[in-house]
Amino acid sequence: IKVPRELPEGAPLAKKEKILPKFTLSGDAPVVNAPSIGPKTAKRLEAVGVRTVGDLLQLDAEQGEEQIDARHISAQVIRDWQAQALLACTVPGLKSREAQGLVACDVRDAAALATKNATELCEAVANWGLSEEGQRAWGSAPAPSVDDVATWIERAKR
């Protein structure tokens, strides 16, 4: 007799998905579609030849900082944008704000996401969501549930 594996009480439950959702971002998308990039920043990036998400991912962060020459756009900020864009391009269905939250919690790619504990990561993202940066990114959207985070993790594994 095969006994069904019991999940611990209250364990995070990822959505059972036969078909994964589409990626929310692709390399050929305009750079303004990338997480954290608004119209003003997109213009600054376009001025140094970064027109698409693919261009952003290829950009040398230190060179970008020098070329853009805006106090608030450091090499680290560029690396964060790149990590957010990479997550949105490689984890099916991941929204911009979710990618921003993950990078803020030092989850910078799908491989790192695939190894995370849903409960701990959910708590970290929720705490970031209370910060000024988190509130700007998250807006009025509800915080992700532990099941949402478990779903991101499962999608990252596929």
Tell me what each language-model feature is.
Residues 1-158:
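C-terminal extensions
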